[in-house]
UniProtKB/Swiss-Prot annotation:
Sequence motif: Cys pair 1, positions: 71-78
Alphabetical keyword list: ATP-binding, Cell membrane, Glycoprotein, Kinase, Leucine-rich repeat, Lipid-binding, Membrane, Nucleotide-binding, Plant defense, Receptor, Repeat, Serine/threonine-protein kinase, Signal, Steroid-binding, Transferase, Transmembrane, Transmembrane helix
Highest taxon listed in the record's lineage: Eukaryota
Motif (Cys pair 2): 771-779
Name of the protein: Systemin receptor SR160
Record-annotated active site: 1014 (proton acceptor)
GO biological process, one term: defense response to fungus
Amino acid sequence: MKAHKTVFNQHPLSLNKLFFVLLLIFFLPPASPAASVNGLYKDSQQLLSFKAALPPTPTLLQNWLSSTDPCSFTGVSCKNSRVSSIDLSNTFLSVDFSLVTSYLLPLSNLESLVLKNANLSGSLTSAAKSQCGVTLDSIDLAENTISGPISDISSFGVCSNLKSLNLSKNFLDPPGKEMLKGATFSLQVLDLSYNNISGFNLFPWVSSMGFVELEFFSIKGNKLAGSIPELDFKNLSYLDLSANNFSTVFPSFKDCSNLQHLDLSSNKFYGDIGSSLSSCGKLSFLNLTNNQFVGLVPKLPSESLQYLYLRGNDFQGVYPNQLADLCKTVVELDLSYNNFSGMVPESLGECSSLELVDISNNNFSGKLPVDTLLKLSNIKTMVLSFNKFVGGLPDSFSNLPKLETLDMSSNNLTGIIPSGICKDPMNNLKVLYLQNNLFKGPIPDSLSNCSQLVSLDLSFNYLTGSIPSSLGSLSKLKDLILWLNQLSGEIPQELMYLQALENLILDFNDLTGPIPASLSNCTKLNWISLSNNQLSGEIPASLGRLSNLAILKLGNNSISGNIPAELGNCQSLIWLDLNTNFLNGSIPPPLFKQSGNIAVALLTGKRYVYIKNDGSKECHGAGNLLEFGGIRQEQLDRISTRHPCNFTRVYRGITQPTFNHNGSMIFLDLSYNKLEGSIPKELGAMYYLSILNLGHNDLSGMIPQQLGGLKNVAILDLSYNRFNGTIPNSLTSLTLLGEIDLSNNNLSGMIPESAPFDTFPDYRFANNSLCGYPLPLPCSSGPKSDANQHQKSHRRQASLAGSVAMGLLFSLFCIFGLIIVAIETKKRRRKKEAALEAYMDGHSHSATANSAWKFTSAREALSINLAAFEKPLRKLTFADLLEATNGFHNDSLVGSGGFGDVYKAQLKDGSVVAIKKLIHVSGQGDREFTAEMETIGKIKHRNLVPLLGYCKVGEERLLVYEYMKYGSLEDVLHDRKKTGIKLNWPARRKIAIGAARGLAFLHHNCIPHIIHRDMKSSNVLLDENLEARVSDFGMARLMSAMDTHLSVSTLAGTPGYVPPEYYQSFRCSTKGDVYSYGVVLLELLTGKQPTDSADFGDNNLVGWVKLHAKGKITDVFDRELLKEDASIEIELLQHLKVACACLDDRHWKRPTMIQVMAMFKEIQAGSGMDSTSTIGADDVNFSGVEGGIEMGINGSIKEGNELSKHL
């Protein structure tokens, strides 16, 4: 009775408990023992106690109630009347893992515990202090924020029967020294993928833990490096080491007789494959993608191999005969992105089980091996793109009934597209890519038989005839891409039936007739591109119903009528190009009402090029945005308008989400039409607009003040209209403006004297009634001045002879005067340069201890006119450079970048130089190129790589630079094996200061100020004294002013450095350079590359540091630095704070580079550094910077929250 009182009488819910027990007895089968009732009751109490410990959330585990059978609880399963399984995946528990160990692990009959993506935090150590049910054999804690060393896994030693443990996608670190003694494991499954595990000691730890029974082991997506000892897991069937930093020979196995799955992709493995795998008879999956294997493909175990991926290595030679042995078993074969050559052998046709073959991006040649390919009766995906195959495409491909994807793009295929390619009514073809070939003739009507077709790309061929109306029957078609052919006739009305259509791209054809209004029935359309045709009629107002439409390109046609106001209803529109048509009427204000209603990222992942026009009379519009999947960039010469229109720059990339919140259009080109009336003031609300071209119309009235609201505009063209009045002062607030053209209007008054107007050339304001800089006509100072000018004019008219005499005397006076002025100018220049050197270093506001840095609006530093530099460039002949590089031989090649290849060369005078061979920039005329060279050559600073000379022959443009002995910071920092240099902290600090000094010079001491646009560690070179020299700073100038727009596309090859605002506005700024510099500084502090899937997974270096800012921030520092000298930790934190300030997501909050230099000076003032790595008297002088910077040295650079604010 006493026991009963304990259970019932002393509890306020005793009646509920009694009812619960009776309920269980009633429903239990007769054979169930009474103990099961008590056991299930205990399980229920344990679960309810766990719920009670959770944060109070009304929607969390709502049916976990004392009056409910626990076997019906959300996520709970029972066996033999006991809780046996708990699955709370994707439940936002938001608790420490210790609660799990206290309440859930002890459940005595629990077999499986799944808490994937449950927002768990804390460490694993609490498990060691808890009980664990003897039946528990599987724990899944993936996708949480559990931290601590992986050696904490030893805490699960209390779970004696644990067989499977999934800790993937957490924040676990390398194994620590402390491990639970006496812990024994019989784990069969261990998943540690996507954590923060780095270093070289993982495998010794695995051996020490006695994981000898492992069958599944994954450490994918970590930061492991070093060599791998001989692997001794006799039961291992699944091993995934992909996406790490291994740079070593292919691992060897003591016993791989049970190995079935091996993934080593995305590392730097090299060496012999065949001998290591020779005894792996059960191997069915082998992925060696993106490694450094070279030479011939070795013989591989052929008994069971089904999936073989060798993509992205340097395998060479003809198609490997060794693969013929695999034909009985292989299902998927990927040999893409290697250097295979020759013809595809007939033996491939014997691979009867093959479902996927990808041999793209190699050098295979010869006639398309049709007979061989037709033997692949089970093939579903066939990718042969980017090779050199010739010949035609036969009807017989229809004999492959399972074929879903056929990609033959970018070859040299000829003939016609066969009419019988889908003659089998049961065909499954979904993707047909034949772009960038030499096909001629019509598009066959019979393509309508490809009823499953989703994507059709026949662009970049020589197809003729009309677009078949029968294509309208392809109900699943999403992509219809036919641009750059010779298609004629009208756009078929039947396309209205393509209800799934997302992309209709028909540019550069000879299409005529109207734009079908019925296209509005294709409600999923994202991209309509019909430019450079002969279309006529009006723009259908019904297109305004396309709420998903993001890009509408109708330029270079014969379209007439008004711009439909209904286009303002296209709430996702970001790109509107209507240039060079016959549009009339006014610009409708409702066109801009969509501002603030942008949909999210409809075009993410589309490959494109943007080609900037050169602005010549023959070249209309701002440029062309083109879909570019499956096309070789060197084939752009085939674009018909390229010949009369020399493009200044080609940008390529993959479309990114344009906005992460509400925004507006980024491109609007209405130029070369017959538009009338005034500019609607509503246009000023288009905050994210980057390019606005209204030139060559008949617009009139005053330029509205509201255009000052276009805060992100980089290109503004209002030329050749009838605008009157003055240039509105509001335009001076457009700080990102890189190009403006107000010429050929009726504007009057003074050109604004402030930036950015003081950087534009005079012809951008010509043929108006404007005055002031940069025009030669000064503005009159008042009535008196006007009267004087009138009198002078009268006197000149009265005495021609006197005027001539005065002119001669004046000319003589000018000659003598210029000699005197030249002498005085040279003296002043020397004084100015000396003053500049002093100015560029001495100013810094002193700060009190413990104060925080504050950035205020600062005046620009005094600037140097580029003409102040005297030393002329050395002109070299092409023969000189050809001889110096041994004909630009690969042996002389020392690097490659976004602007061209770099060669080491020794000139005849013995001097060693670096020669950059530019990519073709055929849009750059000789005069413009020479002018840019002369300008860039005058930019001299000890932290910039100086341009010594140049050479131009035909289309070739060669630049000669001072040679930097130690190459790039990227190589020295991240590839020590290549350079043999180890950078200690004083050396890294010196590099950080030098790079900042060079960038500050470009931003603040040149007119016009120079934006680097591609600041990164590979553009920081190191001379013989390991002094940092910023390189490639002039390339953006050389490639034209258009680089202030869409430069993010050029930077797509170096992700990790691009500031977030570039993805929104596609333009560059000095604050963007500051962000990129902040990434370089992080590289110096952490020793890590800006992007590395092995280090960061889907994140990058900035995001990784941000995550650590929430915890122990010192973990981000390069451990080698602290091993050498632990006392530098405070100094590293101070420099990290500088980096975080540079990396502020809000570009206006970032410091200028002058302010960055001031921070470094303050750090040095408080740390007593040696003079070899400090800012001295000959560096940047900051005392004239208004507002100043304050920084606390002694005290308190707080970890965590304060740093995260800057990120």
